A protein has these predicted regions:
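Conserved glycine-centered short motifs in functionally critical loops
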Residues: 13, 17-183
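Short beta-to-alpha transition helix within the HATPase_c
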Residues: 2-16
Length: 183
């Protein structure tokens, strides 16, 4: 519906701004979600998709060099589990740069230089307010606003958010939230 076309436009404009190519597929769009919840979901989803294109999907020549199709794939999948909706946003991009996340976390005093941290623990850091691995700010990112908005949204919806990633293969963001505001 209206939200799906807005999300598609968002991906197209982010691709134009970054010189990348990506195709968005939405699965389970007919999952029963309360319209109030859907309205509140629009902004977080725009952040999630912008992030997938800007940080995940590589430029066409980099994808070709990695043996991938020039056009990246982003799948937004919705499923219902009892009173909850589980949303997965998967991209086939470069995956999280765990080393860059660690460097930034040490610079910001979130980790000490010799403190061990698993990839999952490092992935959780990207959900923190003000966290970015970008050295420069562009119109899309670098301000550290984005996934923390999604994390805060999940908290207000009694939901949860999880990020997992495999180098060179992409990133999956899982968002769980109540299907209706009354539950």
């Amino acid at each position: 519906g209206v939200l799906a076309s807005r999300l598609q436009r968002n991906v197209r404009s982010t691709c134009q701004a970054t010189g990348k190519q990506a195709e968005l597929t939405i699965e389970g769009a007919n999952t029963l979600i309360d319209s109030d919840v859907l309205n509140r979901l629009a902004d977080p989803l725009l952040h999630v998709l912008r992030n997938a294109v800007d940080h995940g999907i590589e430029k066409p020549h980099d994808r070709a060099a990695a043996g991938k199709a020039a056009t990246g794939r982003i799948v937004l999948a919705f499923t219902r589990q009892g009173q909850q909706v589980v949303m997965h946003c998967r991209d086939d991009g470069r995956g999280l740069d765990h080393a860059a996340i660690r460097r930034r976390a040490v610079e910001r005093g979130l980790l000490s230089a010799d403190q061990p941290a698993s990839d999952d623990e490092l992935a959780r850091l990207i959900l923190m307010s003000g966290f970015t691995t970008r050295q420069t700010i562009n119109e899309l990112s670098g301000r550290g606003v984005g996934l923390d908005v999604v994390r805060e949204w999940a908290a207000t919806m009694n939901g949860s958010i999880k990020v997992s990633s495999r180098a060179g293969q992409g990133t999956t963001l899982e968002l769980r939230f109540a299907a209706s505001l009354s539950t």
